[in-house]
Amino acid sequence: MKTLLLTLVVVTIVCLDLGYTRTCLISPSSTPQTCPQGQGICFLKAQCDKFCSIRGPVIEQGCVATCPQFRSNYRSLLCCTTDNCNH
């Protein structure tokens, strides 16, 4: 009986995740915000457009469910899973 009760408690904790959600820096202001449910990965993407040599790369930060694929116009792409790690 104790084993069954312990199993139920563990399953409940895992399923509910104790209400914890990820916080990531969100562009354009780079302020920490709580990510929507299911989006537990922070990302930082720097990409170049035709004005990159003048103003530098365009920076995008946010929350995603899966890390975006790297593309040829990206200068860098960072995906991470700790709070506010995308700086």
Swiss-Prot record:
Expressed by the venom gland. It is found in: Secreted. SUPFAM superfamilies: Snake toxin-like. One of its GO terms (cellular component) is extracellular region. Gene3D superfamilies: CD59. Keywords: Acetylcholine receptor inhibiting toxin, Disulfide bond, Ion channel impairing toxin, Neurotoxin, Postsynaptic neurotoxin, Secreted, Signal, Toxin. Residues 1-21 form the signal peptide. PROSITE patterns: SNAKE_TOXIN (PS00272). Pfam families: Toxin_cobra-type (PF21947). The keyword Chloroplast does not apply. The keyword Chloroplast does not apply. One of its GO terms (molecular function) is toxin activity. Disulfide bonds join 24-42, 35-63, 48-52, 67-79, 80-85. InterPro entries: Snake_3FTx, Snake_toxin-like_sf, Snake_toxin_con_site, Toxin_cobra-type. Postsynaptic neurotoxin that binds and inhibits neuronal nicotinic acetylcholine receptors (nAChR) with high affinity (IC(50)<100 nM). Is a selective, and slowly reversible antagonist of alpha-3/CHRNA3-containing and some alpha-4/CHRNA4-containing AChRs. Homo- and heterodimer; non-covalently linked. Belongs to the three-finger toxin family. Long-chain subfamily. Kappa-neurotoxin sub-subfamily. This is Kappa 1b-bungarotoxin. It comes from Bungarus candidus. The lineage of its organism: Eukaryota, Metazoa, Chordata, Craniata, Vertebrata.
